[in-house]
């Protein structure tokens, strides 16, 4: 199915805003036979209702270790695997900080696992406050007495790396595991 990931957030975002950037890492070779991802170059500039003609669709054939980069407005889709072997890839998608991520990273990578990751990776999967007023949480297991909203980094037992306004008194509200 050829599609745009951009529509995951509905149609209220102006087209001039690119909400997402995708990386598709080839763990195995991506070939025409094993269904390499199909992509429509230039489709990020098309109107939403324009459909790709077969001769506009190309397969992103690449050797393992390669990466395909494209935005959420680019038409793309998986190809049909006609081989007997699986095509294995890793899709990492980045979206604007004020948008809900497509994958709920907090459930996919809970704090007890995220604590073992590098701080930069923790931030990339959402364990960071982002801009003012975005990314706070309340711990349902430990209702706060006087401070209810906390930045996500506190779930990992640390404060934000890049926030001067961080108050270290908030750390006492998070139990280490």
Q: Where in this protein do the model-derived segments appear?
A:
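Catalytic core of non-heme Fe(II) oxygenases with the double-stranded beta-helix
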Residues: 1-61, 99-109
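Short beta->alpha connector loops
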Residues: 6-7, 73-75
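Activation segment
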Residues: 34, 78-79
